[in-house]
Every structure is written in C-alpha cells, then in structure tokens.
Amino acid sequence: MDKLLIRGGRPLMGEVTISGAKNAALPELCAALLCPEPLTLANVPRLQDVGTTLKVLRHLGVEAERSAVLPDQVRLDATRITTREAPYELVKTMRASILVLGPLLARFGEARVSLPGGCAIGSRPVDQHIKGLQAMGAQIVVEHGYIVARAERLKGARITTDMVTVTGTENLLMAATLADGETVLENAAQEPEITDLAELLIAMGAQIEGQGTHRIRIQGVERLHAPAVPHQIIPDRIETGTFLCAVAATGGDVTLRRTRADHLDAVLDKLREACTELECGADWIRVRAAGRPKGVNLRTSEYPAFPTDMQAQFMALNCIAQGTSRVIETIFENRFMHVNELVRLGAHIAVDGHTAIVEGIARLSGATVMATDLRASASLVIAGLVAEGETTVERIYHLDRGYDQMETKLRGIGADIERIK
C-alpha cells in the first residue's frame, strides 16, 4: 500500500496549477445520464473518485473516455444505457455515487442504486434525496441495501429539505430538469460547484434560475442536448485552500494558477487573519508567509461560510502558529479523527465535543501517521512539510480520492516528498 515520505523544513516556492474541482466533476459526469447525445467535459481532474464515477457510468452503459490529445477532457455518451442499476461493488467506496439516482429516474423512469459509502466522517444520510424525489411523484423503497425508485414522469414540486445538503441539491436539481412543470428547491445549497452544475445543465437546454442562492427554480423540459462546446469545470477551491495553507505553514512564496479567489472569501479572510500576505487576480492567487503565522479561531458552516473541507488543513496550520485557537466543527460529527495523528507529530490539541483547542508550538517532529479520510490526509501532509525530520503518511489512498498528483505538485514547488511502497 502506497505511503508518502516527507522530509520537512523546506519552504515552498514557485508556481502550481490547480486542477478542476472534484465536487463539480462528480455531479457533472453523472449529468451525462440526462442527455441522449455525447457530452464533453473539460478540466476533469485525475482522481480516484473520478475514476470510480466513470466505472459506475460505464457499468450503466455510458461510453466514457479521456481524450488522448487533451487529457483533461472526458467524452461521455449515454445514448444507449444498458442497465438502471448501480451495484454495491461499485458504489460502496464513494458516497457521491448516489448522484446517478436522480438522472436515471428522470430520464428512464426507474433506478436501483446501492446505498453509498465514502469517507468515515459521520452520518451523511440520503433521506433528503429520497424525500425530494418522492415529492416529485417517485415511488421509492429501500430494500436489501438498495434504493429502488420508479416514476412514470417526475412532476414539478416545491421541495424544502430539512437541512442544507449539497449532493441532495444536486440530485434534485438534475432530476427536476426533465420533470413535468416547475420545481422549486428551498433551502438549497449555495456552493460554487452547484452553480457550475446548473451552468452545465443550462447549456444542455435546462431552464434554471436562482443557482447560488437558497431558492432554485427549475422549469422541466422534454429533452436535454449536448452543449455546443465542452463545459469547463471550475477550479478546485479546496485544493487551492490546501496549497495556501501549506505555503503559509512552511514560510513560502507561491503563485497558484488557474484558480478563483472569489470562491474562497472565508478561507482567504482567515489566512489574512493569520498574517499571511495574499495577492489575487482573475485566475491566480499569490501567497507569501510573513513569518510564523498567528492562530485563528474558526467555525465551519455551509457556503459561503468557512468550509468543513478546510477545517483539518487549518488545524495543521494552527498547530505551529502563535497562540491558542479554537476550531468548531458544525457540519459533520466525528471529523476530528486527524487530531490523534497530529498529536503524534507533537501537536498540542484537546477536543471537547465539537470543539478542538489548539495550543500552537514552535515546531513539530516527524513520525509515522495514518490518514483517516480525505481532508485529514491533507492536514497530515501539511504537518509533515513543517515537521523536523521524516514523516511517513500511511493509507494515502484517501488523498488520491481528492487530490490530483499532490506529491508531484508539491515537489514542483520545493517539497522533499516521495511516494513509497
């Protein structure tokens, strides 16, 4: 099983290019199921989760191939779907596999999708997906570990979810594009990835208003078509934030290319609070560490507030910062599993319920640590980059789920890091 070996203490310098957003790519790949024409997506990252999604789609009968000439492009042809079932063997490793449910049901009137897996960071139920589809007229039962759904044609409805749910909003948004009549999604998630999905669907002929707000209106149409040009997936704001934290922690000076500062307001505000110098352009961010950072208090919440997917990386930064800081997690329970591993590197962290109190220290010391989920693995890499001596990060398959060639990009800006067996 692959590991990362990191020799810490080297500041990061130079330029790095940000990949396409994982959390936009996954629903947009699934959106191909809505369209009986070949669809091309550009800026598709090379991630394990993308590979898993493509396996699910191919099982359903989608022809999906990366371009040999433009390897960031993926062509998907869902003209001839051969099955409406996404089996446990494919779905178990990734929660986002549930995103085939809405498109299959909307276009074909039936779907059988295994209950999903993914990161072990707490309960992330799919009941809001089911509730919303039932409001649109679907008949759904959960049996033998599968969601079995049927509908003659989905009907437009006003749907208010009990909580803000990103994948729930995406599933219902895709399903509503082919429904009969108007659907209104209340309490919708506002993430940039949802706006990007909506822009793709609009390019396919969907009628959507209000994306990026808590109320999205969708007027169903009879049929969607492929856009005239490939849809460009937005940059990954979480990869961007992760590299920003790594540079701030190591004392470096790096320019991030092909990214968007306007998707990162809360993260950039906290980095400035930590006394990190930032310059932003239309598609770039320059980050310079002005000495040892200051610890910052943060509280995770739904977009546009501070993202839960950046909590672990900022905790790693706080570990070597001046002062004591509080990190409050409000989105997922059990998302402090990286704490014990950071403590192995010498960090001073105490957890009380949903709050972690971090006492910053001058230096960490290298050790062997174990990744427990996707973003926790990124925090351990950041900690390893600043620790004295060697740090080995085990179980980095978590990292590969959501970061495109992370160690290669880090080496390109000066990190001493290598993948080993």
Curated annotation (Swiss-Prot):
A single GO cellular-component term on record: cytoplasm
Biological process per Gene Ontology, one example term: cell division
Signal peptide as annotated in the record: none
GO MF term list: UDP-N-acetylglucosamine 1-carboxyvinyltransferase activity
Domain of life: Bacteria
Active site, renumbered: 119 (proton donor)
Modified residues (2-(S-cysteinyl)pyruvic acid O-phosphothioketal): 119
Binding-site positions, UDP-N-acetyl-alpha-D-glucosamine: 95, 124-128, 309, 331
Reactions performed catalytically: phosphoenolpyruvate + UDP-N-acetyl-alpha-D-glucosamine = UDP-N-acetyl-3-O-(1-carboxyvinyl)-alpha-D-glucosamine + phosphate
Pathway(s) annotated for this protein in UniProt: Cell wall biogenesis; peptidoglycan biosynthesis
EC code(s) of this entry: 2.5.1.7
Record's keyword terms, sorted: Cell cycle, Cell division, Cell shape, Cell wall biogenesis/degradation, Cytoplasm, Peptidoglycan synthesis, Pyruvate, Transferase
Subcellular localization, as worded in the UniProt entry: Cytoplasm
Record has Ubl conjugation as a keyword: no
Residues given in the record as phosphoenolpyruvate binding sites: 22-23
Family of this protein: Belongs to the EPSP synthase family. MurA subfamily.
Cited PANTHER family: UDP-N-ACETYLGLUCOSAMINE 1-CARBOXYVINYLTRANSFERASE
Biological role stated in the UniProt entry: Cell wall formation. Adds enolpyruvyl to UDP-N-acetylglucosamine.
Stated name of the protein: UDP-N-acetylglucosamine 1-carboxyvinyltransferase
Organism: Leptothrix cholodnii (strain ATCC 51168 / LMG 8142 / SP-6)
